Amino acid sequence: MAAKEVLFAGDARAKMLTGVNILANAVKVTLGPKGRNVVLDKSFGSPVITKDGVSVAKEIELEDKFENMGAQMVKEVASKANDAAGDGTTTATVLAQSIVNEGLKAVAAGMNPMDLKRGIDKAVIAAVAELKALSVPCSDTKAIAQVGTISANSDKEIGDIIAQAMEKVGRNSGVITVEEGQSLENELDVVEGMQFDRGYLSPYFINSPEKGTVELDNPFILLVDKKISNIRELLPTLEAVAKASKPLLIIAEDLEGEALATLVVNNMRGIVKVSAVKAPGFGDRRKAMLQDIAVLTGGTVISEEIGLELEKATVEDLGTAKRVIITKDDTTIIDGAGEEAGINGRVSQIKAQIEEATSDYDKEKLQERMAKLAGGVAVIKVGAATEMEMKEKKDRVEDALNATRAAVEEGVVPGGGVALVRAASKLVDLVGDNEDQNHGIKVALRAMEAPLRQIVTNAGDEASVVINAVKAGSGNFGYNAATGEYNDMIEMGILDPTKVTRSALQFAGSIAGLMITTEAMVAEIPKDDSAPDMGGMGGMGGMGGMM
């Protein structure tokens, strides 16, 4: 086991704080409508220019092990916020940096770290309740477009196209994907399709490694209502598909052992392009969903219950689709070859079942199935002049899409950092059990001003002046950093999803609290890989006389 270096107390916290500040300072310049770009070097190809906080955070790795630990913990804040709400990574990073800096000052002054953490936790819980009270539902297309616009760094075109996509495929149940377009303009395509929450059974099926996805064009789709473990059952189908030179997607109850291993080997050798996923749902619901996919793709479910055997399956039993995209978590079938009359009949059948259903859960699941059959998939094609611009714009569209989904889910609050300032101003009378907890509460409340300060700083204005002006107002009154005006944020269309702001605050408070209570850090001592000493060559000095 390699030797370790251990740092304690102030030394450990100082190193950790350096790492926190390096990462946070690189991320926070992207915040707000006038946020700056960050250029990321890539080992091949042109550098990437981005205003996406989580993309910047992911690139940062520091040489000093202890500083790197601090940076990685803040990276965790950004990535947790991104996973929970799909946006708010920069806000979460700014909040965490402020809490850690102020908290560690208090620890250095002799306060109890555990009490500080309890105070911070208390303030965060109270602030989340205030944010929920401030929240208003996001129900109309205009509000959805405004949320998308703000999240895409004030790009109105992106906000509008996302609102259109949601209008066409449904706000709650519709599936929206983002792709690279072929033109300079953003385009919206609505394609008949279905998405379900089952990913590839083996990462060896991946054929688009940069995205980590499996993409199959014009595949055959084999639907099987049982577990497949014996490859012999699949051989006739595989041979028929190989002759047709088309890819194959297998959707079955499960695939294991020899069958899965053989498919992986065939795929890697290029004999037949194949991928496999588990069928969605469980029990009777799985049977129904397999039947939905069969109707959508024009295939037949191979089920022994109706006398069909897998070994006797023919190409006629297989469904087809224009495209299938499989990630580690879900599968999207685009433009299935099923007949419209069959799909409409199936939708009517599900509608009738919804009317008869007694439990809310059953109704919800049936509505999901109907949306997947009837709603289709909206594809936003991002247009740009160069590859660099394309990557940057695609990041922003994905952020904006996540933000609008979060807004539909939990509503919206006034944007531009105002909601956090309002929540903090309502909590000035909040007290803890002792003086150190009170200070922890103050640390959290002061941190809640940090996102607004950073937005104003990035816009080139004086943060303290703006903070005081916003605090003097009430309700939705705030500062529009894009135009330099003060007004009602919701009327100006500056909205943040409640879920994004709430998640950012909760994750920042949680991880920053852990950092404040750190008392020791352990890291491996780096090996010295310098070249060995060439001491034996010293005797060659006498060659000087040969001149």
Curated annotation (Swiss-Prot):
Residues the record lists as binding ATP: 30-33, 51, 87-91, 416, 480-482, 496
EC number: 5.6.1.7
CDD domains, A to Z: GroEL (cd03344)
Main localization (coarse): cytoplasm
Catalytic activity: ATP + H2O + a folded polypeptide = ADP + phosphate + an unfolded polypeptide
PANTHER family hit by this protein: 60 KDA HEAT SHOCK PROTEIN, MITOCHONDRIAL (PTHR45633)
NCBIfam families: GroEL, PRK00013.1, PRK12849.1, PRK12850.1, PRK12851.1
Family: Belongs to the chaperonin (HSP60) family.
Name of the protein described by the UniProt record: Chaperonin GroEL
Organism field: Pseudoalteromonas translucida (strain TAC 125)
Lineage: Bacteria, Pseudomonadati, Pseudomonadota, Gammaproteobacteria, Alteromonadales
